Amino acid sequence: MKKRFISILLCLSLVLTFVIAASAVTKDTAPTGADYGLAKTCADGNILQCFNWKLSDIKAELPNIAKAGFTSVQTSPLQRHDGNSTWYWLYQPTGFSIGNEIGSLNDLKSLCTEADKYGVKIIVDVVANHLAGGNNGSWAGSIESEMRQSAYFHNQGACSDYNNRYDLIYKNIGMPDLNTENSFVISKVKSYVQQLKSAGVDGIRWDAAKHIGLPSEGCNFFPSVIDANMYNYGEVLEAPAGNSAAAVNNKLVKEYTDYIGITDEPYSGTITGAIRDKKIVKTKGNWTTIGVGADRLVYWGESHDTFSNGDGWTKNLTQNQIDRSYAILASRANSQALYLSRPSSSNYSSIWTGNKGSTHYTSNEVAAVNRFHNAMIGKAEATGTANNCFVICREGGAVIVSPASQNIDVTVNNISGLVPEGTYTDEVSGGKFTVTSTKITGHIGSTGIAVIDPMKFTPAPTTAPTVAPTAAPTAAPTAAPTVAPTVSPSASVMIGDSDLDGDITIVDATRIQRSLAELTVLSSKASIAADADRDGGITILDATAIQRRLAGLDTVAWIGTFINYP
């Protein structure tokens, strides 16, 4: 009786959800992060830096940002300042209150609410090392009244030795250095972080993090202000103690990453420099070589400093050169990569706050790399160089970048045999790549970037073994010949095909619903196929996704594509 009742409920549920899905064809539907294949957390995805953008402009671009595969958006600082609208005034705040040309608190709340609909996370740049004023320590006239106490600043004069750790954390780097050991300063910053969190912010980027001390140096700032439920990473340019001994810098980096992620500028700069010089470098990382996990590191092809500062060097590189560097860095396992939306001007004094930057982030090559990154979460990695190309092999696909050429035929190593044998489509150019157990061969298009898409994969054909027939006894009747059935190669499975019949039908949705009601048991292979939205579990949403596909909505890109099995 119980099973009969459950069966009736399943039938009603199936009919109802299918009718709803079909009727929705004529209505606008709100996509989710799963529809775009975005990572579930900031730490697993890549970041679009909307440098100087108004929050309202970011909000309007959210559909394109999600479609381009960016899990997170990083805004410029939202703290008040008293300067003009040149970009660098955003990094000279007067205190810890929200509201400047970028947007208001209400604008931030509106952005975060809308971003949630797309599965996009919001990261806000926070300036907590210093406030506005002079390099001699004088305060700007508009410093918030409650911050106008000498005890809240270090008052040690200007930094003159950038290889001296004491100077770096206690002296002014152009503006009065906050006393980040002071309990009131800590409480103000912590309160500001919580205000951002309450508005819906998911993460914090800590400006000038290397100029803020650590517990081993008598400063409990980071353990006190960070919210463990938010994403946190800090700007550490070059090394924490400049050109000091490697042992000193290594110790500091490891301590920073006990609390926050950090930028790996040395590795990022090496890769971008190699693209600039049209050469191969064999480095696989910088801070990872001392044991720091890649999940604690942020890479970039360029940053707002390398582009917008007076001595910024990447402003002299083309967007395509930056894209090639980004493709290498953003396809790496576990780490996050930041992509700068370049401002319209490269002149330090002509970059205006609130001006929307380049939308090149929507380009096919950038989006393809992001989708690859998201599809490869949790997958193994092997990197190397061959045939004057950088090669990043992942467990199911690869990214190949030429630093010097385009429109070339290449053969590179299938490093560690991670990429399954078969034929793949390059998601950038649409060309084909053939993969054997040892080699990857194909044509890199005009961008110099190829993304061997794990979701556009035809497995190499397999040949069934030939078994010699066993002679039947004379007295026995002659057996009819047995013909082996034609099956899909065991090395792949079609997403959505929960009954493993090679097609997507309403039966697949029904089978998922029956498994949820414990009326049937899915095999391990069928379970992989049943996870239609690829969120790591089987729920009623998977059945609904298939029904929507059959109704013509097709918002879940994975359905009908192949992935490797096992």
Regions picked out by a protein language model, each given a short descriptive name:
Residues R4-S23:
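Sec-dependent N-terminal signal peptides of Gram-positive bacterial secreted proteins and lipoproteins
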Residues I20-S23, P465-P566:
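Cellulosome-associated attachment modules in secreted, modular CAZymes
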Residues V25-N46, K59-A66, P77, N84-Y91, ...:
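Active-site-proximal helices and loops of the catalytic beta/alpha 8
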Residues L38-G45, Q79-T113, I143-N179:
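Aromatic- and acidic-residue-enriched carbohydrate-binding clefts of CAZyme catalytic domains
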Residues N46-S56, M175-S187:
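Active-site mouth loops of central-metabolism enzymes
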Residues F70-L78, L111-A132, W139-A158:
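Glycine-rich, aromatic-flanked loop segments that form ligand/cofactor-binding clefts
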Residues N135-F153, C219-E235:
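A short alpha/beta connector and helix-capping loop motif
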Residues H443-A464, A491, I559-P566:
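A recurrent domain-boundary module in secreted/ectodomain proteins
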